[in-house]
């Protein structure tokens, strides 16, 4: 179980309060698929992902970005039991979808870049530290089934 300070919780809540899931979710997944093109293999049913423009304009990518970020947001309400919160998703991604667990980290790295771009200098280092800890806890929980 991850231990959270009151300050960390406040920072994470502050970041989530300013994230527009409908904007940041698609941007993070688009960035992930473009920067790490090997991640595209999990999205064969999404249609054309052959160019950056095709990825950015793909409504299935945008929709899944919203789904992924909505799922990531779930941890905010369950910070004291993140592993249990993601147990079912961990099984799904490992046993049915066979997703490389490192891809969770790649998506979260892309999300951090999107968030930093939106926040600019208001995303102070101590806020980013709390955010990274939060994302690491979620990535660990999602990859738990693989261990």
Swiss-Prot record:
GO terms of biological process kind: hydrogen peroxide catabolic process
Binding positions for heme b per the UniProt entry: 64, 93
Tissue specificity statement from the Swiss-Prot or TrEMBL entry: Red blood cells.
Keyword Heme part of the UniProt annotation: yes
GO CC annotation, single: blood microparticle
SUPFAM superfamilies from the UniProt entry: Globin-like
Gene3D superfamilies on file: Globins (1.10.490.10)
Domain Globin: 3-147
InterPro entries in alphabetical order: Globin, Globin-like_sf, Globin/Proto, Hemoglobin_b, Hemoglobin_oxygen_transport
Family membership: Belongs to the globin family.
Protein name (Swiss-Prot/TrEMBL): Hemoglobin subunit beta-1
Organism listed in the record: Boreogadus saida (Polar cod)
Gene name of this polypeptide: hbb1
